[in-house]
Amino acid sequence: MLRDNNVPQYKNNSDYKTNCKAETPTKRLCESLFSFERFYFFLRYGIAYVDHPNGLQKHVMRYPQVFATKAIERHLDKGEQKGIIWHTQGSGKTALAYFNVKYLTDYYSQQGIVPQFFFIVDRIDLLEQAQKEFTRRGLKVNPVQSKEDFAKLIKDGVTTQNKEGKLEITVVNIHKF
């Protein structure tokens, strides 16, 4: 590569020799980022196509969303059934939920389980925003109209409500509890 770019003299440079060592931060970062498992995970779960009014957009997982998803995986692998991921305003909660519907559907399908997903909000404007965002990302969104509908949905344990085989999520306002 150095010869192709007409800079073979760099090979004898002390910086070049230092950066070829296994313990350099750059080498560790590149190797961890492009490990087969991580790269496969990112290609399979870390890209979303969003049907935006201005045209189709490609969204990618941010690194905190990747770390959150991997933390969920670690907790599930240890047998834990609940947990909290703390997010701040504008940190990509809706995107994380979308990415995890994809990821957790595959995770549980390996165990023969069809999961049901709920996205709970505390305001009507957030409910509408979440419904719109999930729909734009290709999820089937199931709105809950009343407390009775919500109770029936949980009691019946019906995990899919569409015949197209689309991934789905139920968006509910906390006031329906």
Where are these regions (language model features)?
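ATP-dependent helicase/translocase motor core
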Residues: 1-121, 125, 129-141, 165-166, ...
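Inter-Walker segment of RecA-like/P-loop motor cores
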Residues: 138-177
